A protein has these predicted regions:
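Short alpha-helix plus adjacent loop in nuclease-associated cores
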Residues: 100-103, 113-123
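Conserved non-catalytic scaffold segment of RNase H-like nuclease domains
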Residues: 1-111
């Protein structure tokens, strides 16, 4: 039996989880090697997105103005992350942002993680 894996990618307002915020979340969950669910949403960071980040990600303030804030998404995230190994390219970045967002809500995120950057460097 294969582990449950959720692939995650985030876009953010910058590189510092304590100061910056998530602007987009994309997830794909696999169970026994089969894709069972996928989800993507823009997230209102409740702060302005710097111009260079807008150019980098293509996400601007207008696009996120009516998007859910992070406090509206943990229930959905749980459906993808519970019981799964979270896989991301440079997982420290994505995991750090998720942990910071959960901390702002008074919660703790405990998640098993796997980094594709580390895997690729070992090949």
């Amino acid at each position: 039996m294969l582990p449950i894996i959720t692939y995650l990618d985030l876009e953010t307002t910058g590189a510092t989880p304590l100061r910056d915020r998530i602007t987009e979340i994309a997830l794909v969950r696999f169970e026994n090697g089969i894709e069972v669910a996928r989800w993507q949403t823009l997230v209102n960071p409740e702060k302005s997105i710097p111009a260079f980040i807008q150019q980098l990600t293509g996400i601007d303030n207008e696009m996120v103005a009516n998007a859910p804030t992070f406090k509206e998404v943990p229930g959905i995230l749980a459906k993808y992350l519970d019981g799964a190994v979270m896989v991301a390219h440079n997982v420290r970045f994505d995991h750090g942002f998720l942990k910071s967002e959960y901390r702002r809500l008074g919660h703790v995120l405990r998640q098993r993680v796997l980094c594709t950057v580390k895997i690729s460097r070992s090949l």
